[in-house]
């Protein structure tokens, strides 16, 4: 047999003890013994008289001796078990998509999946009683966005009547509800459904999901106490998009005596509100209260100025340092709106809102703000002129706001660069620290007593209320178990730190994609454009799976490893790896940057535009269910398109104006 003779694929049935291949008038009998529960291997026949497994990447070399040579007629044996598909190439197979979370990622998914895919079964689960994600669950006093309101919008939505430059949290929550109603998404959303367990079923290529939900109320008076316990349900999915984000898990700070306090103790992430969802009623009787606020991050810098005029006395306990920035893009906003300077509270007037009702003016306003915001990337790179300039500006700004108590600057103003931590506008925070009824306390807390806070120097503050504004669990240790191939858990895979393929997916966890997962956030700027692009990327993957009858898709280990190496090298050039405590580094001063995307906003948009399909491993569905004989071209179907087979629709659609790409003629 010539040495360059082609390999001939041969498949062997589990229930067969031999496979006969006829070639060059000779017959080859291959004796094989395969256990009934074993996976059916697919082999290639080589010219050296051996069979080798076709499946690459498992690192296993195997061969079976042949009793004779081969010839081209063995192709017939290779196709044993293949059955031509009966569907047209453009008939999409039924496809089940489950989205976890009804925040902005889930809302975008609800809009785009149904817009861009056909024949799908979509369900969006959320543990909360309403939509909005972090904007539903976070309701603390003063909650607001930290980027301009008109930049924190979906690209295809135009809200012109925001009340303030930094949109209040309740307004954002109402906006998410409006979008859900506009696009009729509640038919896909199931509230009060909390994911507790997800496991990938390898034979079927589906995720098996367990969720906890309230048990349906009983109509009988004799219902037992167990009837009020939550019930567990199961669902399955061909494709999962987890949009849980990093601001959905919180815990109490590790301070001695926290449970001993006899007064009221609150966490910013679990603030009690009335039915309207606004926080004002919860602090209505605090006028005679002594309140302690623990923290100086973005949450604390919103709570302190909000509570200061509403309480008798306020103590702000601060452990670390942080930069407080001027109004982000405030000068740009003022210039477009025609103001001489940014107003103190940055609220929009009726005149402003009337201007913004004009579609062309609104487009100019929003485009100007976002262009300016996207020009700030060099602030995050060490040693750049823009980085040095911003540090000087922030220092001048903070000192100008602390003239009454200038000593605070020594404890609050950092030595690290302005973007080592996420930029904190904190409008009104520095001014609140100057108030006579506020004590800035830059000392460590020793413990909480029954009546207040004891510091390490022995000082004790009597308090009526303690507010813990101590952030979130940003370790990506999700509150539900995710089990991939071979019983591997996502928690184990993310130890000692999360590793992903471009922040979206992980090897060993097929058909599981993430929005706002590890390394997907920015140090400054709006996250919504990222969420949109992550969802759109996930849809491209899901469409490919549906169209090409792919059972599973997952990134190659080498691709995950290479992205991890890129992360390591990129962040060495940035301010993010300086010595500062940040949630980017899971609350540590030094260590791995797990929260941020390695690049700019525009960089991530470009990254997600065109998937690199060569970075993925695939498994295909069997052409005959249960045969164990997948064929990558089964999706070609019966050789027809739907319209020509049924003699319906446009049979020359490629000539439509929206399909023809007319090239320009060179001059």
Where are these regions (language model features)?
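Extreme N-terminal leader/targeting segments of oxidoreductases
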Residues: 2-97, 115-119, 218, 233, ...
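Core beta-strand elements of the Rossmann-like FAD/NAD(P) dinucleotide-binding domain
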Residues: 227-239, 286-287, 456-465
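Rossmann-like dinucleotide-binding core of oxidoreductases
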Residues: 77, 87-94, 98-99, 104-121, ...
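Beta1-alpha1 glycine-rich phosphate/pyrophosphate-binding loop at the start
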Residues: 58-73, 95, 99-100, 104-189, ...
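Central helical "cap/lid" subdomain
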Residues: 255-265, 451-503
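A conserved short coil-to-beta-strand element within the FAD-binding core of flavoproteins
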Residues: 191-207, 438-456
């Amino acid at each position: 047999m010539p040495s360059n003779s082609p390999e001939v694929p041969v498949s062997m049935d589990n229930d067969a003890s031999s496979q006969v291949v006829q070639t060059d008038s000779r017959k080859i009998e291959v004796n094989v013994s395969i256990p009934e529960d074993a996976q059916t291997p697919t082999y290639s026949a080589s010219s050296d008289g051996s069979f080798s497994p076709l499946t690459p990447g498992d690192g296993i070399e195997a061969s079976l001796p042949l009793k004779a040579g081969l010839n081209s007629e063995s192709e017939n044996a290779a196709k044993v078990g293949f059955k031509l598909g009966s569907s047209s190439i453009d008939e999409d197979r039924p496809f089940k998509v489950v989205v976890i979370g009804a925040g902005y990622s889930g809302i975008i998914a609800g809009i785009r999946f149904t817009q861009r895919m056909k024949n799908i079964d979509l369900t969006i689960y959320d543990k909360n009683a309403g939509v909005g994600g972090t904007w539903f669950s976070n309701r603390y006093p003063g909650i607001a966005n930290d980027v301009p309101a008109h930049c924190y919008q979906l690209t295809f939505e135009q809200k012109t009547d925001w009340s303030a430059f930094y949109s209040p949290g309740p307004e954002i929550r109402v906006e998410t509800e409006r979008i859900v109603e506009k696009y009729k998404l509640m038919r896909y959303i199931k509230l009060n459904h909390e994911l507790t367990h997800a496991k990938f079923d390898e034979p079927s290529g589906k995720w098996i999901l367990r969720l906890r939900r309230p048990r349906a109320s009983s109509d009988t008076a004799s219902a037992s106490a167990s009837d009020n316990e939550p019930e567990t349900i199961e669902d399955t999915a061909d494709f999962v998009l987890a949009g849980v984000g990093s601001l959905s898990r919180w815990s109490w700070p590790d301070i001695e005596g926290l449970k001993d306090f006899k007064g009221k103790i609150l966490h910013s992430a679990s603030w009690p509100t009335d039915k309207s969802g606004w926080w004002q009623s919860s602090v209505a009787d605090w006028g005679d209260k002594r309140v302690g606020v623990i923290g100086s991050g973005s949450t604390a810098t919103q709570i302190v100025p909000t509570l200061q005029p509403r309480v008798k006395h306020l103590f702000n306990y601060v452990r670390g340092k942080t930069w407080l920035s001027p109004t982000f893009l405030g000068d740009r906003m003022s210039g477009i709106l025609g103001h001489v300077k940014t107003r103190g509270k940055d609220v929009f007037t009726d005149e402003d809102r009337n201007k913004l009702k004009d579609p062309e003016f609104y487009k100019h306003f929003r485009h100007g703000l976002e262009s300016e915001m996207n020009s700030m990337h060099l602030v995050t790179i060490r040693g750049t002129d823009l980085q040095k300039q911003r540090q000087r500006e922030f220092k001048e700004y903070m000192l100008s706001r602390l003239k009454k108590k200038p000593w605070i600057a020594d404890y609050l103003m950092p030595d690290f660069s302005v973007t080592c931590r996420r930029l904190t506008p904190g409008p009104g925070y520095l001014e609140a620290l100057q108030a006579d009824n506020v004590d800035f306390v830059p000392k460590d807390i020793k413990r909480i007593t029954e009546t207040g806070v004891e510091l390490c120097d022995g000082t004790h503050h009597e308090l009526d209320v303690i507010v813990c504004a101590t952030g979130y669990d940003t370790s990506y240790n999700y509150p539900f178990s995710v089990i991939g191939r071979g019983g591997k858990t996502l928690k184990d895979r993310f130890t000692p730190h999360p590793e992903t393929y471009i922040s979206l997916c992980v090897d060993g966890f097929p058909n599981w994609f993430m929005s706002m997962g590890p390394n997907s956030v920015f140090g400054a700027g709006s996250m919504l454009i990222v969420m949109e692009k992550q969802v759109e990327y996930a849809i491209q993957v899901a469409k490919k799976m549906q169209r090409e009858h792919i059972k599973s898709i997952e990134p190659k280990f080498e691709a995950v490893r290479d992205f991890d190496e890129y992360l390591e090298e990129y962040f060495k050039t940035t301010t993010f790896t300086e010595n500062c405590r940040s949630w980017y580094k899971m609350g540590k001063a030094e260590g791995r940057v797990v929260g941020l995307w390695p690049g700019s906003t525009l960089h991530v948009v470009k990254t997600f535009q065109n998937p690199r399909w060569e970075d993925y491993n695939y498994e295909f569905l069997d052409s005959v269910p249960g045969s164990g004989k997948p064929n990558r071209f089964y999706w070609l179907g019966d050789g027809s398109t739907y319209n020509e087979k049924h003699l319906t629709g446009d049979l020359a659609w490629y000539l439509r104006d929206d399909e023809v790409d007319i090239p320009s003629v060179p001059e």
